[in-house]
Amino acid sequence: MMGSVQTAPADDRFRGWLRIEPVAGLSEERWDPLLICVAGYILTAVGRLHQLFGALEAIHLAAIAGALTVVIYLANTREVRRPGAVRCLTTNLVGLLVFWMVLSLTTALNAGVSVDLVFNNFIKTALISFVVAASIRSVDDVERLAFVYLAGAVIYSAIVMTRFDVGSGNDWRLGHLYYYDANDYATFTVTAMPLGLYFLNRAQRRAVRLFAAVGLVVLTLGFVWSGSRGGFIAFAAVAAYVVFRFKAIPLRRRLLSTALVVVVLLATASDHYWEQMSTITSDTDYNHTEESGRLQIWSRGVGYMLANPLLGVGPGNFAVAEGTLSPMAARQQFGIGVRWNAPHNSFIQIGAELGFPGLALYIAILVSSFVALRRAGDLRPSLTASLIGFVVGSFFLSLAYSEMLYTLVALAVGVQKVTATRQVQPRPCCESLN
């Protein structure tokens, strides 16, 4: 209590920073070692915290966080965290996607590329995504991890903007950053913005609201610096959803919060930025006219799907297909260089690499994640908006296997787990941040 002369135990003081009022009828849950490790995983796998600070990368923080998360989960004895608690349509679909990726190894153009992606990357991502969902004990934990996701995006943005500069001319926007390129980063910021709006309007602790407000400014500035046109489209989609569907926050406050972001965008966007955005619908843009533009790449990607409808060209092999199967590939025998392009579309990426069954599984994972959020209470609009931001942004990017997506999917599954058997009752929002 604020006026008490007694000192709370250290554990209670730590819990007070991110303590969430439990759903009515549940016992109060604290931060525990598993949830702390899950937070560390999100900060490293999505927020790339270890790459921002050399000392953390030197000690292999990402590997440590992931390993500890799995080890502590395996030692779990609580019923709410048992594997059966998160066996649902979405997790089953992710499991089927992993199986289909392994099956697609048999027809991969370059087996080494596929084996590396499947066994050194995606299986780990899918496994820890399952553990993230399983670690969630209540809606409280979802709020905690959503705040960690937001904090990771804000920290990443702040560091990037202090270490990378934008100049003039062709150098007016950010380029390749830590792990993400500028377009990936723009989508990351867009997925975090709805969470910032949620904590800005729902948190009772002033420090948390201040962090959310400053975080939104930082995210918006970083978003502008990215100069991403696909990110701009994703931002517009999220903004429309926030204004018209974000019912957990009163309309007046939604409009004011959105206005804050828009004002920062208008105040910081340069003429180069708006010139770049104006080319989105231009028929003369390289994406429309050049063979390395997105439309031509997507067209060839559909061709790879039709030529390999069942198992695709193999996980991670889209670029290999560009260099060996595309109409331009024959030029290489004459000493003419050919660009081995990325798909620049997550749906084309999955469809070309895993065939139509893989594409169907991917779409089903996305749809089931949205469905999983239908009873998420106050968190539904923010997490739904984050997923919308990812889906729209990833339409122009190669993010089908990304930790960003499967962390959001894990939060959706976690919400479904803790609300599946009971109606979410009104409760003090964000008391975990009080």
Where do the model's predicted regions map?
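Long extracytoplasmic/lumenal interhelical loops at the membrane interface
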Residues: 176-178, 284-299, 306-307, 311-354, ...
